[in-house]
UniProtKB/Swiss-Prot annotation:
Organism of origin: Carboxydothermus hydrogenoformans (strain ATCC BAA-161 / DSM 6008 / Z-2901)
Gene Ontology CC, one term: cytosolic small ribosomal subunit
Pfam family for this entry, one: Ribosomal_S3_C
Gene3D superfamilies per record: 3.30.300.20, Ribosomal protein S3, C-terminal domain
Gene expressing this chain: rpsC
The KH type-2 domain, residue ranges: 39-107
GO biological process, one term: translation
Protein name from the UniProt record: Small ribosomal subunit protein uS3
Length: 222
């Protein structure tokens, strides 16, 4: 069976960037990594309905900058910025560091793989047919400008005795082309029969990596 490499991990440094932008020595790395995981888990749990796709964390000495990519910024910011201020204080209390929070709005959530996966998982939890949820997500993504999409659901689908995987795809999804901008998302649906895993790959077109401009010195003849 062919196993798939993580599409984002494969493209880091080429057309994708890190979600954690900091560096630490061996002594402090473990502590900071666990702090990152706590921050991400806390924000995702607190604002699960806000459609948070990505959380980017940057560090500088005793300061932490958190950028939240969300489809519903109003839900995270709150009325007059109350929610975001509460979140900032809670994170400062948790980490003991100065926290700065930025909000980045996701303009087209229909072609954000993580949000699509979470939406399908939420529908499966509401007992909507997984086939219907997959087909709707695929048609919406293509309508909103995706060049290709692939969705996989794995587990005891429709309460079957034996777990299986089902795929649905349309368009093209070139997984091994490094310049291909492929977004990947994963979510789990908690059903009475057990967990159902949902994976989504969305192809948004080709992106050429930025070439660093080097000054070429020309030698002139005397």
């Amino acid at each position: 069976m062919g196993q798939k490499v993580h599409p984002k991990g494969l493209r880091i440094g080429i057309i994708k960037d890190w979600d954690a932008k900091w560096f630490a020595d061996k002594k402090h790395y473990q502590e900071l990594l666990h702090e990152d995981l706590k921050i991400r888990k806390y924000i995702k749990t607190k604002f699960y309905q806000a459609g948070i796709s990505r959380i980017v964390i940057e560090r500088a000495s005793n300061r932490v900058k958190v950028t939240i990519h969300t489809a519903r910024p109003g839900m995270v910011i709150g009325k007059g910025g109350t929610e975001i201020e509460v979140l900032r204080k809670e994170l400062e209390k948790m980490t003991g560091k100065q926290i700065n929070i930025n909000i980045a709005e996701i303009k087209v959530p229909e072609i954000d793989a993580q949000l699509v996966a979470e939406n399908i998982a939420a529908q499966i939890e509401k007992r909507i047919s997984y086939k219907r949820a997959m087909k709707q997500a695929v048609s919406r993504a293509l309508k909103m400008g995706a060049q290709g999409i692939k969705v996989a659901c794995s587990g005891r689908l429709a309460g079957a005795e034996i777990a299986r995987s089902e795929w649905y795809s349309e368009g093209k999804v070139p997984l091994t082309t490094l310049r291909a901008d492929i977004d990947y998302g994963f979510a789990e649906a908690l059903t009475t029969y057990g967990k159902i895993g949902v994976k989504v790959w969305i192809y948004k077109g080709e992106v050429l990596p930025e070439v660093k401009k080097e000054s070429v010195s020309t030698e002139g003849g005397e």
